[in-house]
Amino acid sequence: MAITIKKVSTKKELKQFIRFNYKLYKNNPYSVPDLYDDMLNTFNKKKNAAFEFCEADYFLAYKENQIVGRVAAIINNKANQTWNKKEVRFGWIDFIDDPEVSEALIRTVEEWGKERGMTHIQGPLGFTDFDAEGMLIEGYDQLSTMATTYNYPYYPQHMERMGFEKDADWVEYKIYIPDAIPDKHKRISDLIQRKYNLKIKKYSSAKKIARDYGQAIFELMNEAYSPLYGYSALSQRQIDQYVKMYLPILDLRMVTLITDAEDKLIAVGISMPSLSEALQKSHGRLLPFGWYHLLKALFMKRRAKMLDLLLVAVKPEYQNKGVNALLFSDLIPVYQKLGFVFAESNPELELNGKVQAQWEYFKTEQHKRRRAFIKAI
């Protein structure tokens, strides 16, 4: 039976696009659904600030009048300009285990990209680094996180069959929370705090942290992450959007800022309780009862034993000087007090030695790996 590809053009079809992932992974113990309303906003060209510099279309694959696959075709013009590339991205790709389906989806993205002057196709990638990146190639028996996507083992097999090659890998670590701050960690943090006259800043009010350092946090990200794979700087509209979206839901005990002698932000560490199990229980919906599971995971005492390390950023001139040790010397006692057993690092670029070096004094387990693929079109 022939595969039919249809561009999403109505709100009903967009909802089907989002829900196909839920259907394909229904009852899968490792997949964590995205929040449905967040996905609606992400794909909305009027609401997502990334569309200032991105263009995209979404496609559904049908077989015998049933949806059997989906994919987003994306061009991040800012990233292409930054890295001097002509690449079309495929993102949010899902398909049944049928080569005709995956080939039809990828062929559609290739043709869409060619029409717009692109020379290569890469992915899975989203609009920006704030979207999930990479296809899982190791760790299929591990629970996914809110910041990543899960996929079946047959996905990368389809990619390789279609001639895709490795473009970049991310690794993920399970980091066990120590009973005490490692001695060397403590010595390093004390030394660099005195040497550079650094201060640890903590907040209890989302409004105050947004007022004082909301803008600076995301400007620091632009500085720290600019050399990383595919990164494109956040625009002012994106920064405003993220400050409004993310800061109010954080447990600020798990947010540590480090400033210099002039109170300028030089490092930030942001973590939060894992929402993986809560999102599974809510099935990606806030209503009618999904909000309860999420609030319980975030703020109630009987929370998950796992936390997610969402963001660690250090100003370039302070990297490799022990600032990460200072961040975690403040955060580890918080994790212990709140009863966390281990942390998920979330994806780190395989070749980013600076990031992986910060786990040197912890017991860790590299338990997942994901890949971005690329090929000429």
Which positions does each model-derived feature cover?
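Generic start-of-chain signal for non-secretory N-termini
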Residues: 1-30
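An acidic- and aromatic-residue-enriched active-site/binding cleft used to recognize and process polar
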Residues: 74-78, 93-95, 126-128, 178, ...
